[in-house]
Amino acid sequence: MSKKGKKPKLPKAPLSEEDQLLIFQQKMLADEEAAKKKERLLTQFLKDKLAKEEHNSALNLNKINTQWRTILREVKTRELHQDIEILSQTFERVVDCKDSVIKSLAKDLTEAEEQYAHALRSHLHNIDQLLTLQRRRLGLLEENYNMELEVLTKEFETERKLIIDHHEKEMHYLQDVFMAMEQNYIDSEYESKLEFQSMWDDLKNKNLEEKHFLRLQLENIVEDLWRRFQDALKNYTDATEDRKIAFEYLKVKDEKSSKEIETQMKKIQKLQETIGILKGKIVAHSREGEWQNQCIRNNKELVHVQLRKLKVQRTQARTLSQENLVKLTLESNATLKALKKVVEKGEKILKLAEICRKFETEEEKVLPFYSSVLTPEEQEEAKLQNPEDITEDLAKIMMDYAGMENFWKRYNKVKLEVLSLQHRRLQLLDISSKLREMLKQYLDGISVSDEVLSHLNPLFVVNHRSNLPQLPPPSAQPVYNVIEAAHIASHIL
C-alpha cells in the first residue's frame, strides 16, 4: 500500500544556458572567496610566524650576548690571572732587586757618613786654623791700612791747602790782570780820543790860518795890482811901451801867483784827504770796538744757549732715567711673573711626575732612562760632526743644559709610547668595527625585521626565493615546477 503523503518525484527540467552561466559565476565567486580567505589565512600565518621569529631572534640574541659575555669574562679572567701571576713574579723579582739595592745603599750610606764625619772634623780643624791665621792677617792689614790712611790724609790735606792757595793766587792775579787790561783799554781809548780831537783842532786852526793868510795876501796883491793897474792906466797914456812892459811883468807875476794859488789849493786838498783818512780810522776804530762788543755779546749768547742746552740735556737725562727706572721696574715685574710661572710649571711637572710614577712599569722604575741606541762609533761621529759651527758660548749653553738630556729621553720615550698606543688604538678600533659588522651581518641573517628586509640578505628566503638580485636568465629557459601556496598552507594547517 503506497503512502498517501508522498508525492512522486518529477524529473528535473533541463537548465538553460543563462542558469548554467549564473551557477558557474556563483561557483567562481565562491572559489575566489575561498582563495582570498586562504590567502588572508596564509598572510596572517606568515605575520604570526614573523612575530614569533622576531621574538625568538630577540631571545636568541640575548642568549648569545649572555653566553658571549660569559665567554669574554672567562677569557678576560684567565688573562687577568696570567697578568697577575706575571706581575706578582715581576714584583717579587723587583722587590728582591730593590732589597739588594737598599742593602748596598745602606752600607754605602754608613760608609759615606763615617767618611763625612771624618772629613767634617778635619775640615773644621782646618777652618779654625785658617780663621786664626786670617784674624792675625786682618789685624796686621788693618794696622797697615790705618797707618797708610793717616799718611795719605796728611798728604792730601797739605796738597789740598797748596792747591787752594795756588788757586786763590791765580784768581787774584787774573782779576788784577783783567782790571789792568780794562783800565789800559779805557786809558788808551781816552788818549786816542784826546789826540784825535787835538789833531782835529790843530788841522782846523792851521787850515783857517792859512786860508786867512792867503786871503789877506791875495787881497794885498789884488790891491797892489789894482793900484798898479791904475798907475799903468795913468801912465798908459804916457807911453805905450812902458805899459806893455808893465803888462808883461804883471802877466808873469799873475802866473806866479796863480801857481802859488794852485800849490796852496793842493795843500788844502792834501789836508782834506788827511782829514778823511783820520775820519776813516776813527770809523774803523769805532767799528772794531763795535765788532769786539758784538763778539762779546755773541759769546754771551752762546754761553746762554749752551746753558739752556745743558738744562735741556739735564731734563732729558732725568726723564730718560725715570723712563729707564719705570722700564726696569716693569721688566723686573715681568721677569718675576715669568719666573713665578716657571716655578709653577716646575711644581706642576713634579706633581705630574709623582702622579705618573704610579703608572710606571717595573722596568721603568728600575731603569728610568733608556740607553742610547747609537753605537760608540756613531756617537764619536756625532761628536766630530761640524765642530767649527759650535762656538764657545754655544758649548757653555750646551753644558748648562746637559742635565736636561735624561728628561728629554723620558719625554721622547713617553711620546713614542703615546704614538704607539694611538696607532694600536686605531688598529683595535678597526678590528672592533669589522667584528661588529660581521656580528651584525650574522644577527641580521638569523633575525627578521623591517630593517633587515629592506636590505639585501642572502640568508633571507621567502617562498624559496632570496631578495638578492636575480642573475640574467640563460638562453635556454628551464622548466620549473609550480606549487601553489594554498596547498602548502593546507598541509601546514
From Swiss-Prot:
Pfam families: NYD-SP28
Record localization: Cytoplasm, Cytoskeleton, Flagellum basal body; Cell projection, Cilium, Flagellum; Cytoplasm, Cytoskeleton, Flagellum axoneme
Protein name per UniProt: Dynein regulatory complex subunit 2
Organism: Mus musculus (Mouse)
Function summary: Component of the nexin-dynein regulatory complex (N-DRC), a key regulator of ciliary/flagellar motility which maintains the alignment and integrity of the distal axoneme and regulates microtubule sliding in motile axonemes. Plays a critical role in the assembly of N-DRC and also stabilizes the assembly of multiple inner dynein arms and radial spokes. Coassembles with DRC1 to form a central scaffold needed for assembly of the N-DRC and its attachment to the outer doublet microtubules.
Lineage top rank: taxon: Eukaryota
UniProt keyword Cell wall biogenesis/degradation, yes or no: no
Oligomeric form and interacting partners: Component of the nexin-dynein regulatory complex (N-DRC). Interacts with DRC1.
Record-level GO cellular component terms: axonemal dynein complex; ciliary basal body; motile cilium
Keyword terms: Cell projection, Cilium, Coiled coil, Cytoplasm, Cytoskeleton, Flagellum
Annotated family: Belongs to the DRC2 family.
Main localization, broad class: cytoplasm
